[in-house]
């Protein structure tokens, strides 16, 4: 860039928010911090998140760096893995009597007292650690909150025989999530089910919506939040899935190289999130290519027969299921007609983060946590103060 162009850019956007400057996040950090402070990489504060009550056009502020060039890792920044123990109390392995060959794996921090339980389901190809950083941000705001983030079958550390690992039908995944919630309650000896907020990203959004619509968890579900997936745009995006899979690397020389690729390609735009979640996406296997032994754990191509099944009818179910509803998107262009009408009718809450990529909760964990906590508080039944019954007032001798 010429000096003239840089001068113009600074005059246009402000010297302190030059979108063409190299990123300064974690500069000089060359060791893994014991407890890294999970923050949104975006320079704007959590209070600046775009919240809309209609489907009007949103104009992002200049400091959101929407057009920043894909960058490598800044000099001095560490790429060391951050362990799951930084964010969760324990990991659990759960076996269902209905399907004992499948051993579910999940990360858990138990709720305290009457605190809520955020039950989280990741997207295709991801893992429960996708929600690690946002989980810590939720607990900063609600210290009694619990977090349950499972690894879907065929993903993460959940084990299933080969013939069952990729039974990725939507009703199977919905049953899996229900089983994990019930088995966790039994495993932890909870006397009753805590109030639940279901949270799902991408494929996970379809799963939590299906479970909410089924009503299996009864009145314990306060509401459900869906992250960056709607029926229309999801089905359209399936057309380019093969192109995406063919262009990403088949493997990486080191775990750190895999983390760096996710940051450089802006697949994940927050280095703390990438260092936490990416290691669970890869597995060491030098049989295919010793020079790139870190391979993808999940064969996304094998899930193709189920892609349309995941999303067909999603908008209708999302609007019809009982409980509070929230949709978090990276752009209003993702709304389809059915959801646009539903938004105009006030049927659900809509939050838009135009500065985020598809992995909203990883790119902007603090802002996502603020939205989820506010969503819970709006739907928290224990916070409701009901007026006294007329019969009780009469018994007390009061005039009515």
UniProtKB/Swiss-Prot annotation:
It comes from the Eukaryota. Pfam families: Abhydrolase_6. Its EC number is 3.1.1.89. The keyword S-adenosyl-L-methionine does not apply. Residues 1-72 are annotated as: Disordered. It is an enzyme of class 3 (hydrolase). Belongs to the AB hydrolase superfamily. This is Protein phosphatase methylesterase 1. The lineage of its organism: Eukaryota, Fungi, Dikarya, Ascomycota, Pezizomycotina.
């Amino acid at each position: 860039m010429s000096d003239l162009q840089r001068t113009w850019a600074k005059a246009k956007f402000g010297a302190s928010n030059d979108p063409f400057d190299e990123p300064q996040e974690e500069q000089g950090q060359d060791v893994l911090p014991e407890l890294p402070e999970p923050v949104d990489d975006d320079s704007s504060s959590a209070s600046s998140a775009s919240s809309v009550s209609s489907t009007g056009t949103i104009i992002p502020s200049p400091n959101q760096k929407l057009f920043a060039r894909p960058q490598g890792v800044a000099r001095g920044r560490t790429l060391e893995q951050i362990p799951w123990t930084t964010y969760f109390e324990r990991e659990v392995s759960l076996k269902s009597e209905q399907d004992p060959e499948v051993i579910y794996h999940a990360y858990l921090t138990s709720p305290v007292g009457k605190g809520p339980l955020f039950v989280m389901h990741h997207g295709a190809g991801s893992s429960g650690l996708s929600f690690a950083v946002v989980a810590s941000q939720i607990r900063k705001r609600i210290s009694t909150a619990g977090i349950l983030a499972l690894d879907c079958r065929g993903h993460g550390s959940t084990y299933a025989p080969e013939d069952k690992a990729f039974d990725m039908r939507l009703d199977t995944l919905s049953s899996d999530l229900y089983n994990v919630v019930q088995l966790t309650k039994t495993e932890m000896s909870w006397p009753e089910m805590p109030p639940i907020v279901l949270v799902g990203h991408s494929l996970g959004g379809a799963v939590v919506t299906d479970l909410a619509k089924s009503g299996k968890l009864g009145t314990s579900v306060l509401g459900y939040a869906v992250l960056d997936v709607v029926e229309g745009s999801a089905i359209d995006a399936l057309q380019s899935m093969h192109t995406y899979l063919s262009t990403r690397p088949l493997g990486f020389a080191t775990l750190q190289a895999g983390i760096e690729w996710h940051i450089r390609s802006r697949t994940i735009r927050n280095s703390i999130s990438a260092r936490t979640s990416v290691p669970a996406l890869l597995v060491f296997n030098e049989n295919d290519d010793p020079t790139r032994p870190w391979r993808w754990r999940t064969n996304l191509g094998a899930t193709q027969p189920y892609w349309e099944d995941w999303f067909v009818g999603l908008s209708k179910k999302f609007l019809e299921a009982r409980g509070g509803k929230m949709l978090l998107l990276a752009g209003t262009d993702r709304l389809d007609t059915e959801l646009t009408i539903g938004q105009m009718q006030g049927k659900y809450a809509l939050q838009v983060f135009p500065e985020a990529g598809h992995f909203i909760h990883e790119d902007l964990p603090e802002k996502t946590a603020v939205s989820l906590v506010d969503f819970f508080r709006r739907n928290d039944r224990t916070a409701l103060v009901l007026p006294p019954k007329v019969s009780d007032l009469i018994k007390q001798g009061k005039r009515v």
